[in-house]
Amino acid sequence: MLSTTRLLALSTLLTPILAHIALWDPAMYGWTDDPNQWDPVVPLMHLPFDQWWFHGYMNVPPAEGKFMTLPSGGTYNGQVACNKALTKYGQNPAQQTGIYACDGPTDQGGIGAMHTSDKWNSPDPVDLKGCAIAIAYESDPTKIKPEDFTVISVNHKCVWFKDIDFQIPSDLPPCPPGGCHCLWEWIHADDAGSEQLFHLAYRCTVEGATGTRPLPSHSQQMSC
């Protein structure tokens, strides 16, 4: 039987892992070398603009030369998880074997972090609101405004599985020198916990881009 001290230590270690979800990529603003990093999964609802914009990491850019690479006409293969340790960027392979975006110590797994009314291990979850990648053709993050971003790819089965694909359009124009900036956005409904906003920024580039037309003007998302 575990001692009280060991139980308390275990609960402390699990607390961040039972938080929420992020799309993990080394080109993320706020990325650190900590293989157990969890702070990018903290939700942002009701925070002032300067605290939620770029997740508050405007002054913590990715390392020089790091880009989220979006293959023109191809697929961006990413990983969403409630802790970096569960992804390929962790240091313990035994923690990376799960197929879901979060793990947990009970028979409910990591369902709480996914904010869905679907049952754990459901083969065909239906209460998922999807997440998206948006792009802005500006290399200087201080010049970017929310309205500069255009959504270019949506995954409607997000978040559920850890491995996630985003189909990238084939007609995107090349990024400017210094690259583009991308966002990962997820707003889950309030039917499984309070409504929350998840928002992370990345330095990105479009590999093999040959498009010549600028992206269409953005419009406010609507239910359909």
Feature map (PLM): residue ranges:
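Membrane-associated scaffolding surfaces of BAR-superfamily helical dimers
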Residues: 11
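Extracellular beta-strand-rich recognition modules
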Residues: 78-80, 182-186
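Short glycine/proline/serine/threonine-rich loop/turn segments at secondary-structure transition edges
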Residues: 174-180
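Peripheral, solvent-exposed domain-edge segments
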Residues: 2-6, 15-167, 177, 192-224
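Flexible gly/pro/ser-rich segments immediately N-terminal to CXXCH heme-c attachment motifs
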Residues: 171
